[in-house]
């Protein structure tokens, strides 16, 4: 099923330009979105808690910084650009008690709304505006007069403003209309995003890379060669896949590599498909969200243990040496 797609010519930038936007958070996304809004002639202010290390940075870049509850009381559109696991705590204390009918609260990911961590009052709009890329890329592409694909979704309508028109206009201010703004739902964005991260982009890729590296090491191959073949060259293939697609990738590799890929895909594909279906099921039934929020409540014991252990692995130790020339050039 094809999603509706909107471009600059379809979207009225004046909608968001007529409203006061408040951005909660000034991390990578918050900074990039605030700067893009300003360059798109949109009024934007930043909301941060007292003592935040980001206050001086936001002020240095010319933004007015308010406490979160004050920002909420003086904004038409409030963008919650915080880590997913902080939404419930921050919004319940600093945002929801101060909302008025007609305001709109926006999110860059559907997690907290879809999994009922955040429930907004009736008459307050809930929109999703999700750039398909990190904050650094969002800003860089905007400055090059290009943009990233954006997803928008409407979970709840505003009693005053047209939530869809606001979401589209906001995405245009981000540069999204230059590339394409696709309309979806909070559910679809959230579940597909989590699945992509876990099964392919982060979890899946890391598992394949590490297992490949360890397989070669165990078989007696030098660590340097194992790293080159299983880690270093991933970027070359990923770039081809990004710009050329699967067929284009096939056309740019040798017959040996293509035939080997087909042979390897057959046994690996069957196993991966079953595992991926289980991963998706746990996302859909809320098991993953429950586990993640429990992890947060315990102050991230699993994450902290994994991060510490990763530093001691052979793949990281040899990788640090081999990456040094590239990092030095930067």
Curated annotation (Swiss-Prot):
It is an enzyme of class 1 (oxidoreductase). It catalyses: (2R)-2,3-dihydroxy-3-methylbutanoate + NADP(+) = (2S)-2-acetolactate + NADPH + H(+); (2R,3R)-2,3-dihydroxy-3-methylpentanoate + NADP(+) = (S)-2-ethyl-2-hydroxy-3-oxobutanoate + NADPH + H(+). Substrate binds at residue 254. GO terms for molecular function: ketol-acid reductoisomerase activity; magnesium ion binding; NADP binding. One of its GO terms (biological process) is isoleucine biosynthetic process. Residues 185-329 form the KARI C-terminal knotted domain. GO terms for cellular component: cytosol. The active site is at residue 109. Mg(2+) 1 binds at residues 193, 197. Pfam families: KARI_C, KARI_N. PROSITE patterns: KARI_C (PS51851), KARI_N (PS51850). Binds 2 magnesium ions per subunit. Mg(2+) 2 binds at residues 193, 229, 233. Involved in the biosynthesis of branched-chain amino acids (BCAA). Catalyzes an alkyl-migration followed by a ketol-acid reduction of (S)-2-acetolactate (S2AL) to yield (R)-2,3-dihydroxy-isovalerate. In the isomerase reaction, S2AL is rearranged via a Mg-dependent methyl migration to produce 3-hydroxy-3-methyl-2-ketobutyrate (HMKB). In the reductase reaction, this 2-ketoacid undergoes a metal-dependent reduction by NADPH to yield (R)-2,3-dihydroxy-isovalerate. This is Ketol-acid reductoisomerase (NADP(+)). The gene is ilvC.
